UniProtKB/Swiss-Prot annotation:
CDD domains: RHH_NikR_HicB-like. Its cofactor is Ni(2+). Ni(2+) binds at H80, H91, H93, C99. Belongs to the transcriptional regulatory CopG/NikR family. GO terms for molecular function: DNA binding; DNA-binding transcription factor activity; nickel cation binding. This is Putative nickel-responsive regulator. Pfam families: NikR_C (PF08753), RHH_1 (PF01402). Transcriptional regulator. It comes from Methanococcus maripaludis (strain DSM 14266 / JCM 13030 / NBRC 101832 / S2 / LL). Binds 1 nickel ion per subunit. Keywords: DNA-binding, Metal-binding, Nickel, Transcription, Transcription regulation. HAMAP family: NikR. SUPFAM superfamilies: ACT-like (SSF55021), Ribbon-helix-helix (SSF47598).
Length: 141
């Protein structure tokens, strides 16, 4: 049997309710198993992102609560620190509380990962998704 550690976490009520619906829908035996599965998925994504190398082009999509203190200013300042990677940005109002920014990037994969990590860690950021491709003629036929 695998050693297990018991942990405690705090979640917003609506987030847990939505997660519980998915647990039931997918037929998990327990909430713990669903959380373990979610953590495994997160670890796989993290390893994939951090294994990228070389020149890449892609997008960083960010959803954030624009009422969160200084979040827009912090995101803008971070983007200015990586201006050599950023080709363009698109800003969209999703609803009264949330905005989405799509940042088009091209450059070294390591620097793109670094930029993504900095954007992700900001308070008020709800979700970040990095999508990258190999630019130019390096696409398999």
């Amino acid at each position: 049997m695998v050693d297990m550690d018991r942990i405690s976490i705090s979640l917003p009520t609506n987030l847990l309710a939505e997660f519980d619906e998915i647990i039931e829908e997918r037929g998990y035996a327990s909430r713990s198993e669903a959380i373990r599965d979610s953590i495994r998925d997160y670890l796989i994504k993290h390893k994939w992102i951090h294994s990228l190398e070389g020149e890449r082009a892609g997008t960083i999509s960010i959803i954030y609560d624009h009422h969160s203190t200084d979040v827009m200013e912090k995101l803008t300042n971070i983007q200015h620190d990586y201006e050599k990677l950023i080709v363009a940005t698109i800003h969209m109002h999703l609803d009264h509380d949330h905005c989405m920014e799509v940042v088009l990037v091209k450059g070294d994969a390591g620097e793109i990962k670094e930029l993504t990590d900095k954007l992700t860690s900001q308070k008020g950021v709800k979700q970040v998704k990095l999508t990258v491709m190999v630019p130019g003629g390096n696409i398999p036929q």
